[in-house]
Structure formats: C-alpha cells, structure tokens
Regions:
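Generic short beta-strand segments
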Residues: 64-70, 99-102, 186-197, 232-238, ...
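Short helix-loop boundary/capping segments
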Residues: 179-253
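Extracytoplasmic beta-rich ectodomain segments of secreted or membrane-anchored proteins
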Residues: 139-186, 191-194
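An acidic-aromatic
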Residues: 84-156
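N-terminal secretory signal peptides that target proteins for export/translocation
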Residues: 1-16
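Acidic, serine/threonine-rich low-complexity disordered tracts
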Residues: 79-81, 230-300
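N-terminal leader/targeting segments and the immediate start of mature chains
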Residues: 13-19, 27-84
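A short, structured loop/turn motif at beta-sheet edges
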Residues: 55-57, 172-183, 259-268, 298-300
Length: 300
C-alpha cells in the first residue's frame, strides 16, 4: 500500500509537471517572433482590402504622379505629363497638372523611363488644376461651366482608381521583390471589366472635350454660330460612332502594381498599364498603352 501511495504521488507530480511544461512551451511558442500562429502572412486579397480601408480613413494626403501614352509602333511616350494631388477634409481632392520636364525630386526630367523630350505638350504655357468632391462613393468634378475639360482629369485620381478596382473582378497576386517593409501586389482586371471601364473613361473624356468645344462655339457671334454648332455636332457624332465601333472589337488588358507598407498597411505607390489592341479604319492592328505611376507622399 505504501509503495502504491508513492506511485500515485509520483504519478500526480509527473502529471502536474507535464501540465506546467506544456504551459511554458505554449507561452514560448506564442511569444516567439515570426511565429506563424501570431504573424500569419496575410493573403494578397487581405493586403489590398486593408490598404483600401487605410486610405479611405484618411482626412488628408498628398501624392505625385506621371502619365503617358505609349504606342507600339514607336515605343515612345506621347502626351506625357506630370501631376500632383491633395486630399483635404476626407472628400475634397485637387489635381494639378505640370508640364513635362518639370523638376522632380531627383532633379531630372526623366522618370521611370518616360522621357520628357518625347512629349508634345510643350506648346502649353502651363498646366491646370481641377477639383473633385466625393459624394456617395463617387467623385464629381467641381469645374466651372466654361472649363469642362478639366473634369477629364478624374482618370488620374489614384483614390478613385483603388475604389474602382475594388468593385471589379480581378486577380491579385503577391509580386516577387516584396521586402520586410513592403508588400507588392500585382492586380490584373478581368478582361471584360477592363474593357468596360476603359470605354467608360473614353466616353467621359469625349463628352468633356465636346462640352469644351461647344462652349467655345456658343461664344461666337453672328450668323455663322448656328452653322458651326451644327457642324461640330456632326463631327462628334461621327467620332463617337468610330470610337464605339473600335472599342467593340478592341481587347483591353489592365494591370496594376500596388506597393503597401507592411507596418501601416497604407499604399505607398500605385502604377498601372492599360493596353488597348484595336483595328483602325484601314483594318490595321494597333496597340496603345496608357501608363501611370503615382507615389503617395504624406498621410494625415
């Protein structure tokens, strides 16, 4: 009986010791840096969602960017320009364009392979600005009636870009090259959604240009005013019909690269390339790419 009691006591001590050991091991595992139980790597979809939520909660932010059109036939950038933007009061955004060749942070007129010398905007004396207000999730241009063309700058609003990406079908993958401080996501829109969005943006810009020219025609005095307005309407109808026909047969591929800060989950950079392959009036195949690169500077 005495030996049995000792065995029972030894068994109880051993069991108690095992519980203590398991508890200590659990504490060590849970507190170990880099442990998968606590620091699970977020999926690309989760990283994008957190980045979108992070930027949506900011009252103020600043960004700078550059955009240009590249044609496959020449490989050069055309219609290149730089821009900068400022968000205030959460829903008020101002975009300001700048001429190619403006001094950059590095003091160079060439950024990300885009050579300012290839741009054709040098005839303009300066850039211009446009203001936007976010209402019910949509960005509306706050431009004067005599300056409708400024509203076409909405294409270069990176916040609206991220919001629209969220609504569309897409594939998100982690890109090689992500470091300890950042995650790089490759986001490719579904072809149907990419084409529909490109068509919508082209229509918006066509309407803005039409409104600009019709306004100028309305300021003309004399008997030729009505004739000019009629001719302009006919030209735009033909242009819209041609664009509609072109986009019906076109193929669009849009890919974004989003760099996200691992610590804050805020976007640091958003670059994109939207390639459009289409046939012109002579049935010749053409390929153009709209390239955009935005760097987010400060958040508040």
């Amino acid at each position: 009986m005495e030996n049995l009691g000792r065995k029972d006591g030894f068994y109880m001590i051993t069991r108690q010791g095992m519980r203590t050991l398991m508890l200590l091991l659990s504490v060590i595992i849970l507190s170990a840096p880099g442990c998968g139980l606590i620091h699970r790597e977020r999926t690309p979809e989760e990283v994008f969602s957190m980045a979108l939520s992070g930027i949506a909660g900011k009252e103020k932010l600043d960004f700078v960017g550059e955009a240009g059109l590249r044609r496959e036939s020449s490989g050069l950038f055309e219609n290149q320009f730089k821009f900068e933007g400022k968000l205030e009061n959460h829903d008020q955004l101002t975009l300001q364009t700048r001429l190619p060749g403006a001094v950059t942070a590095a003091g160079s007129s060439k950024v990300n392979g885009m050579d300012a010398a290839s741009a054709n905007l040098t005839t303009q004396p300066s850039g211009f600005s446009a203001s936007f207000q976010r209402k019910k999730g949509q960005w509306e241009a706050l431009t004067a009636e005599q300056e409708p063309l400024r509203g076409s700058l909405s294409r270069y609003n990176p916040i609206a870009q991220l919001e629209n990406i969220d609504r569309m079908n897409k594939t998100i993958k982690s890109e090689y090259g992500s470091g300890r401080r950042t995650r790089i996501l490759r986001i490719e829109l579904a072809p149907e959604d990419a084409k529909a969005w490109a068509t919508t943006q082209l229509n918006d810009e066509m309407n803005a240009i039409k409104a600009e020219y019709m306004h100028r025609a309305s300021n003309i005095k004399g008997k030729n005013k009505a004739k000019l307005e009629k001719e302009l309407s006919q030209v735009w109808q033909q242009g819209e019909a041609s664009m509609e026909q072109m986009m019906k047969q076109a193929k669009v591929q849009t890919v974004y690269h989003l760099t996200v800060d691992r610590k804050t989950s805020l976007p640091l950079r958003l670059s994109s390339e939207s390639q459009v392959t289409y046939q012109d009036a002579s049935n010749k195949s053409n390929k153009e790419a709209l390239v955009m690169d935005v760097n987010f500077k400060t958040y508040d």
